[in-house]
């Protein structure tokens, strides 16, 4: 049967050769830790600038509106790998970060990449926040203004708390997306999962097995996380209906 031949061919191509694990398991443990640290910290760092960008996008001042629009357009219209190269080889060539380890994190590698990912993520999270703010009934803002609150006070005390609550699942989804996108950092030597697989593949000459293994790791991280986010969204929707 053709599928049995396919299985044999895949086996010959080392698809299922995980013999490297006993010796190189620590590479993948470090890779998982670096991947999760990059992803979570990047999205957390992106939240404040993203919120500012969203408010700027909603501003009636044409300059402020245009400035935020230009930022979002640049980061959403250029490849992440190009952004990483400009920030890592450009900005952080000027700003020298000491080669210091904090636990498993090497700061001179981690900081440039987490800043790059955060700047990229902020462009997407800004649109998430903007949609969340626009989804809040405008009547609530008008009611707050009628009670004597300023536009800023109405935004801070009435609109933003509701908008942030509504966009939390989307922010969690952004972390899942960032887990996958952080793999591009391997091109510049960041020791995350993709970098670990490349190193192990090059050292052991097992061409495909290490990449199949990290694909399984990515799946085991992202699939349960996605299902948990869906469950949270359903629970929040039920809560809103009560």
What are these regions (language model features)?
Residues 1-242:
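Transmembrane alpha-helices and adjacent helix-loop boundaries
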């Amino acid at each position: 049967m053709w599928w049995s031949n396919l299985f044999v061919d895949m086996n010959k191509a080392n698809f299922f050769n995980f013999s490297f694990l006993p010796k190189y398991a620590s590479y993948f443990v470090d890779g998982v830790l670096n991947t999760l640290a990059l992803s979570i910290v990047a999205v957390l760092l992106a939240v404040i600038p993203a919120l500012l960008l969203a408010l700027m996008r909603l501003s009636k001042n044409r300059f402020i509106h245009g400035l935020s629009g230009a930022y979002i357009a640049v980061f959403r219209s250029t490849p992440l790998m190009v952004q990483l190269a400009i920030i890592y080889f450009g900005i952080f060539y000027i700003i020298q970060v000491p080669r210091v380890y904090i636990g498993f994190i090497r700061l001179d590698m981690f900081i440039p990449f987490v800043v790059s990912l955060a700047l990229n993520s902020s462009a997407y999270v800004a649109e998430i926040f903007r949609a969340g703010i626009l989804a809040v009934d405008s009547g609530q803002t008008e009611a707050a203004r009628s009670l004597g609150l300023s536009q800023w006070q109405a935004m801070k005390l009435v609109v933003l708390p509701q908008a942030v609550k509504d966009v939390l699942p989307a922010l969690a989804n952004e972390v899942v997306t960032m887990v996958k996108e952080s793999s591009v950092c391997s091109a510049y030597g960041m020791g995350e999962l993709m970098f670990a697989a490349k190193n192990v593949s090059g050292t052991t000459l097992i061409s495909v097995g290490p990449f199949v293994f990290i694909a399984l790791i990515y799946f085991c991280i992202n699939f349960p996380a996605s299902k948990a986010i869906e469950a949270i969204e359903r629970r929040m929707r039920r809560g809103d209906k009560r």
